[in-house]
Amino acid sequence: MEKIIIYGGTGYIGKFMVRASLSFSHPTFIYARPLTPDSTPSSVQLREEFRSMGVTIIEGEMEEHEKMVSVLKQVDIVISALPFPMISSQIHIINAIKAAGNIKRFLPSDFGCEEDRIKPLPPFESVLEKKRIIRRAIEAAALPYTYVSANCFGAYFVNYLLHPSPHPNRNDDIVIYGTGETKFVLNYEEDIAKYTIKVACDPRCCNRIVIYRPPKNIISQNELISLWEAKSGLSFKKVHMPDEQLVRLSQELPQPQNIPVSILHSIFVKGDLMSYEMRKDDIEASNLYPELEFTSIDGLLDLFISGRAPPPTLAEFE
């Protein structure tokens, strides 16, 4: 059974990766920054929870090369779930993997769009370029890799688009970006994590791009809103934000506030997630494992109805 280390294992998608790794009985490690007096109680509690489940947590900085090398010599698979602001720091992981010499697979922090095939507005493009640089460094070092394009984190974007969780300042207006007809892919985070752990250990996925594009999870904003209204019994006022407004905001807002609007434009206006055909060498994840199945969008919305969905959060860009 492969030993798996997850960088960013206490972050948003990283938490799902850790739990998925444990669910498949992999010895699981996390490399995380040391806690500080400013660390939140939830951060402390999460680490205690993971330790109680058998996770080995190594605290260290990305610049601690010798420490990382010694840790990597104890594991087989490296998964990076680092957030946007730390994308470039993955070069330290690459250098440590090269020095350790034993790693069977490295999965860099992709998990969103397929960055080598799209060209979004400049603020988001600058983020993707950092990811491309990491990919090229992996290839130049001849490291065994798998690139995962998981598309949209399902619960994250349901929270963002539909704001289903009740709170005092809740606004029942729903913003529709562009016409609302553009198709995108919505995958539940728990499924993304399970498939990622599987592909990380699957010889068929070595040095390949794996795209999570299950046909049943391709949907438009208008379809998603209609499904949610029918399921929740609620009715919403729809406010359209046209293409031109998103482009203007991407130009006028300061960094990093201009990045989220550029992402919204890429997904919901340009349709970048569905803008390319699968290549012969691509692997579509839903065809790989008969014992696994992606949660349908209907099933994802049921999690919100029952109160079992992840709470709202926002990605970090600085």
Swiss-Prot record:
GO molecular function: nucleotide binding; oxidoreductase activity
Annotated EC: 1.1.1.318
Active site, renumbered: 131 (proton donor/acceptor)
Gene Ontology biological-process entries: phenylpropanoid biosynthetic process
Tissue: Mostly expressed in petals, and, to a lower extent, in sepals, stamens and pistils.
Keywords: NADP, Nucleotide-binding, Oxidoreductase, Phenylpropanoid metabolism
InterPro entries referenced in this protein's UniProt entry, alphabetically: NAD(P)-bd_dom_sf, NmrA-like, NmrA-type/Isoflavone_red_sf, PCBER-like
Pathway: Aromatic compound metabolism; phenylpropanoid biosynthesis
Site, as annotated: Required for activity: 263
Any Pfam family the entry gives: NmrA
Catalysed transformations (reactions): eugenol + a carboxylate + NADP(+) = a coniferyl ester + NADPH; eugenol + acetate + NADP(+) = (E)-coniferyl acetate + NADPH
Residues binding substrate: 260
CDD domains: PCBER_SDR_a
Superkingdom, natural source: Eukaryota
Site feature (Confers substrate specificity) residues: 84, 87
Residues that coordinate or bind NADP(+): 10-13, 32-43, 47, 83-86, 109-111, 131, 151-153
Role played: Catalyzes the synthesis of the phenylpropene eugenol from coniferyl acetate. Phenylpropenes are produced by plants as defense compounds with antimicrobial and antianimal properties, or as floral attractants of pollinators.
Similarity annotation: Belongs to the NmrA-type oxidoreductase family.
Protein name: Eugenol synthase 1
Organism listed in the record: Clarkia breweri (Fairy fans)
